[in-house]
Amino acid sequence: MVVIRLARGGSKKRPFFNIVATDSRNRRDGRFIERVGFYNPLATEGEEGLRLAQDRLAYWQGVGAQLSPTVARLVKQGAAKAAA
């Protein structure tokens, strides 16, 4: 099953997450099919904290990919921010 979830990057105490489409059996930071965005929880005012390729996200959901709970929350948050 394909899932869309966070893959941790960055250094110690400085998290950075790639939002990736991957097989559910792969490791968290292992091989992935496609990178569909990123999330930077420590972004400052001038930096972009969340970027999602909405077209690719819609494609993967259309072919049956499941969102992880955290990614679902981020998608909802990004949609609310885009609407505002």
UniProtKB/Swiss-Prot annotation:
SUPFAM superfamilies in the record: Ribosomal protein S16
GO molecular function terms noted in the UniProt entry: structural constituent of ribosome
GO BP of this protein: translation
Any Pfam family the entry gives: Ribosomal_S16
Keywords from the UniProt entry: Ribonucleoprotein, Ribosomal protein
Cellular component terms (Gene Ontology): cytoplasm; small ribosomal subunit
HAMAP family in the cross-refs: Ribosomal_bS16
Similarity comment: family membership: Belongs to the bacterial ribosomal protein bS16 family.
Name assigned to this protein: Small ribosomal subunit protein bS16
Organism per entry: Cupriavidus necator (strain ATCC 17699 / DSM 428 / KCTC 22496 / NCIMB 10442 / H16 / Stanier 337)
Gene it is expressed from: rpsP
